[in-house]
C-alpha cells in the first residue's frame, strides 16, 4: 500500500498557476503559427490554414475581452476598419487564440517531462517509446502468446471531464474557464476524440488544440496500466507520444487509496502476469497474454470498472474483444495480424530404423487487408467501390511527369509501409488500380485512349511504379536467377516509418 501511495504522491509545487497572462504575449502566437512547427507530420503549412500574419497582442486582448461579453467574437462595423480582419468569421478568431492556448497548455507537460529527465526518473528514453518498438514486439513476442484483447480507448461522456483532467495539472482558474469556452465553442470536439478517429484526421483548423486534448485524455486512461507495469517487470508499454507514459493520478489519490486500501493486495496478484504485454497506437491498443481466457476476462472487468468508477469514463464492455491468437486475426497498424501453427514432418534415421516426427512451430503473420485497402483507395477517388480504376481530375497546368510521379509515389509509399507484410502479392491489385487510374487520368487530359497512351510511353511508364526493393534487386540480380518469391515473403520493417500510412489507416 505504501508503494501505491508513493507512486501516486503529488508534487503540488510543479502545478502551474499563472498561465493565463501568457495569452497576451506575442511570441506565443509566433510559436503557434511558425512554419517549422506547423510543417510537421501533424500540422499543415501555414498557408493551408489561412493565417495571414496579422496576429498581435492588441487583437488578442480584444478577442478575449469579447469572449467575456454577451456577443463574444462578433466584430462590429466600427471595428472592421480598425483590426484589419474584414471578411473573417468568428471561427478564425477562436482558431487563432486556441492555437496559442494549446501552446501554453503544453507547458506543464513539458516542464514535468524535463524535470523527470533531470531527476533520472526516465533512464535515457526507454519509456518514451514510438511506433518502432511495436515492430520487434510483433516479431519476437507475439508468437509466444495465447490471447489478445482489442480495446478502443474510452471517450468522455461530457466535455467537463476533459477540463477536470487538466485541472489536476493546472491550477490557473482563468485558463480553465477559457478551456471551457473553447470546448463549448467547438461542440463537435467531443466527436473528434473518439477511438475510431486518428490523430491525423483532426480538424485542420484546430489540430494543435485537439491533439493536445486527445493526448491528455489518453494520458489519463493509461494511468492504471502504467502503475501495473511497474508492478510487473514484464508488462511492456508502447506509446506514440512522448509524455503519455509519465502518469500520476493527482487529484484522485484520496478516493483511490480509500477504495483500494482493503482489497488492493487481494487483486494485485491478478495483474502480476509475467507474460502480459500492452501496446498502443493512436486510439486503439491491445493486451496480449500467455495466460488463460479467464485471466483476460478479469483484466477486462477490472479495466472497465476502474475507468468508470475512478475516471468517470464511459467504457462499454463490448469495446473490448478477447480472442485466441491461433484462430483470430486482429487489426492493428494497418495489418491483419495472427499467429498460425505450422506443422512439418521430420524424418530421423537411427541405425536401421527411421522415424517420422511431427513438429509444430508458431509463426507470426501480418497480412494486408486488401478489401479494406481497396475501400480506402476508392474513398480517395482512384477507383470505384468494386475496385475498377477511374480517372482523377488534375490541374490543367500539371505536366505528365508530375502526374506520373504523384501516382507512383503514392504506390511506393504504400508498398514501403506494408513491407512488413508476410505476403506482399496482395499489393499487386493496388498497383494495378493506381497504374490504370494514372493512365486514365493522362488519357483524359490529352483526350486520347488509354491503349494509345500506354503504347506511346512504354516501359518508362511502368518503371515509375517499381518499389525501391524491386529497383535494387533488378540491378543486382538477373531476373531469372533471383528467387523472386522470397522477396515477397520476407518481412522488412523500415526505421523511417514514423506513423501509419493514410491509405492504410482505414479503420
Swiss-Prot record:
Entries under Pfam families matching the protein: Intron_maturas2 (PF01348), MatK_N (PF01824)
Species the sequence originates in: Liriodendron tulipifera (Tuliptree)
Keywords: Chloroplast, mRNA processing, Plastid, RNA-binding, tRNA processing
Family that this chain belongs to: Belongs to the intron maturase 2 family. MatK subfamily.
Origin organism lineage: Eukaryota, Viridiplantae, Streptophyta, Embryophyta, Tracheophyta
Biological process per Gene Ontology, one example term: tRNA processing
Keyword hit for RNA-binding: yes
Domain of life of the source: Eukaryota
Broad class of where this protein is predominantly found: plastid
Function: Usually encoded in the trnK tRNA gene intron. Probably assists in splicing its own and other chloroplast group II introns.
Record-given protein name: Maturase K
Subcellular localization(s) per the UniProt record: Plastid, Chloroplast
Single Gene Ontology MF annotation: RNA binding
UniProt xrefs under HAMAP family: MatK
Amino acid at each position: 500500500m505504501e508503494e501505491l501511495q508513493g507512486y501516486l504522491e503529488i508534487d503540488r509545487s510543479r502545478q502551474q498557476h499563472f498561465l493565463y497572462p501568457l495569452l497576451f504575449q506575442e511570441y506565443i502566437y509566433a510559436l503557434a503559427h511558425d512554419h517549422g512547427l506547423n510543417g510537421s507530420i501533424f500540422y499543415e503549412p501555414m498557408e493551408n490554414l489561412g493565417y495571414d500574419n496579422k496576429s498581435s497582442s492588441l487583437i488578442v486582448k480584444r478577442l478575449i475581452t469579447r469572449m467575456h461579453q454577451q456577443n463574444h467574437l462578433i466584430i462590429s462595423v466600427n471595428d472592421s476598419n480598425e483590426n484589419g480582419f474584414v471578411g473573417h468569421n468568428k471561427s478564425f478568431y477562436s482558431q487563432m487564440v486556441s492555437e496559442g492556448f494549446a501552446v501554453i497548455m503544453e507547458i506543464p507537460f513539458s516542464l514535468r517531462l524535463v524535470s523527470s529527465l533531470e531527476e533520472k526518473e526516465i533512464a535515457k528514453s526507454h519509456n518514451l517509446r514510438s511506433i518502432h518498438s511495436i515492430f520487434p514486439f510483433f516479431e519476437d513476442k507475439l508468437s509466444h502468446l495465447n490471447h489478445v484483447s482489442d480495446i478502443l480507448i474510452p471517450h468522455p461522456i461530457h466535455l467537463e471531464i476533459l477540463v477536470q483532467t487538466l485541472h489536476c495539472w493546472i491550477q490557473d482558474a482563468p485558463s480553465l474557464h477559457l478551456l471551457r469556452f473553447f470546448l463549448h465553442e467547438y461542440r463537435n470536439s467531443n466527436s473528434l476524440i473518439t477511438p475510431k478517429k486518428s490523430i491525423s484526421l483532426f480538424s485542420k483548423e484546430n489540430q494543435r488544440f485537439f491533439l493536445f486534448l486527445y493526448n491528455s485524455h489518453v494520458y489519463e486512461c493509461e494511468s492504471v496500466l502504467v502503475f501495473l507495469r511497474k508492478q510487473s517487470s514484464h508488462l511492456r508499454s508502447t506509446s506514440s507520444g512522448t509524455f503519455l507514459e509519465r502518469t500520476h493520478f493527482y487529484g484522485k489519490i484520496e478516493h483511490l487509496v480509500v477504495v483500494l486500501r482493503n482489497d488492493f493486495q487481494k487483486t494485485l496478484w491478478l495483474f502480476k502476469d509475467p507474460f502480459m504485454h500492452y501496446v498502443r497506437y493512436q486510439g486503439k491498443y491491445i493486451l496480449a497474454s500467455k495466460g488463460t481466457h479467464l485471466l483476460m476476462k478479469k483484466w477486462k472487468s477490472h479495466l472497465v470498472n476502474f475507468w468508470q468508477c475512478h475516471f468517470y469514463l464511459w467504457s462499454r464492455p463490448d469495446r473490448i474483444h478477447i480472442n485466441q491468437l491461433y484462430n483470430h486475426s486482429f487489426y492493428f497498424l494497418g495489418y491483419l495480424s495472427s499467429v498460425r501453427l505450422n506443422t512439418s514432418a521430420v524424418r530421423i534415421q537411427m541405425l536401421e530404423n527411421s522415424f517420422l516426427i511431427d513438429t509444430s512451430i508458431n509463426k507470426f503473420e501480418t497480412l494486408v487487408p486488401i478489401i479494406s485497402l481497396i475501400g480506402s483507395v476508392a474513398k480517395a477517388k482512384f477507383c470505384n467501390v468494386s475496385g475498377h480504376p477511374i480517372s482523377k481530375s488534375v490541374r490543367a497546368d500539371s505536366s505528365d511527369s508530375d502526374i506520373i510521379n504523384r501516382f507512383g509515389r503514392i504506390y511506393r509509399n504504400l508498398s514501403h509501409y506494408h513491407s512488413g507484410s508476410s505476403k506482399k502479392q496482395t499489393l499487386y491489385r493496388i498497383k494495378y488500380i493506381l497504374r490504370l487510374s494514372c493512365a486514365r487520368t493522362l488519357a483524359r487530359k490529352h483526350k486520347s485512349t488509354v491503349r494509345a497512351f500506354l503504347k506511346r510511353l512504354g516501359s518508362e511508364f511502368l518503371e515509375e511504379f517499381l518499389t525501391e526493393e524491386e529497383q535494387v534487386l533488378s540491378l543486382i540480380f538477373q531476373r531469372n536467377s533471383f528467387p523472386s518469391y522470397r522477396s515477397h515473403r520476407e518481412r522488412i520493417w523500415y526505421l523511417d516509418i514514423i506513423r501509419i500510412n493514410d491509405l492504410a489507416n482505414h479503420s
